[in-house]
Amino acid sequence: MKNNQCSKVGKVNFPKHTGININMMPFIMGDINSIPKEYRCYKDIINSCNIHSSEIGKIGYLTITESFVNKGKPQRRGGIHTEKTPTHSWGGDDGGAWGGKSGLFMASNISDSCQIWNYHVDVPGLGGDCSHLRDKLGKGIKMSSNELYWMTDSCPHESLELKNDCVRQFFRLVTSDVGVWYEKHSTKNKLGVNPGCKIIKENKFKNAS
């Protein structure tokens, strides 16, 4: 494991929540018109990602989750994991701190709802699982509200149980180095922008690979 796998990018402001729920929707990075109008309210956060020039014009993947979450429940996938799996990349890892060419960006409007560790996991478990590393990772970094973070797809993180009932807004932008796109678990772009990788139609958790 090595560090320099995550860092703060800067403050962001979330738009008024409207119940958006999209996952890994493909769009053309640098072209806001490739994103359906109802999601363009996140334009300022997308621009804050300061995507590397080598990624402009390539396919990126947008996730926005706006939902009510009960106290004591995580909004998203629980357990420590990486975005990459043993067989597929999920944003890439150029091995350096923010300013690199690949990786992914995340933000939330609720503090302490996600925890990240500034480490590189060479070989995660099935589905990116890193629960076996919990004792070795030590204290993580709890993400602050309205703060944009960059990380590689080798950076372990977990969605945390929320301290109070709330409406949580979650934003993620994954850059182009994605190995596969799971059709059953992802959102198609109604403007016709297709994934820039292999499309898998089966359940992604079938083999958790």
Q: Where would I find each of the regions flagged by the language model?
A:
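Structured loops at beta-to-helix junctions and adjacent beta-edge loops in soluble globular domains
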Residues: 65-67, 83-85, 107-110, 152-154, ...
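A residue-level signal for beta-strand positions that form part of recognition/binding surfaces
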Residues: 11, 103, 168
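N-terminal auxiliary "cap/dimerization" subdomain that precedes the catalytic jelly-roll/cupin core
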Residues: 1-59
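Hydrophobic alpha-helical segments and helix pairs
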Residues: 38-97
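Catalytic core of Fe(II)/2-oxoglutarate
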Residues: 130-208
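Catalytic core of non-heme Fe(II) oxygenases with the double-stranded beta-helix
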Residues: 73-145, 181-185
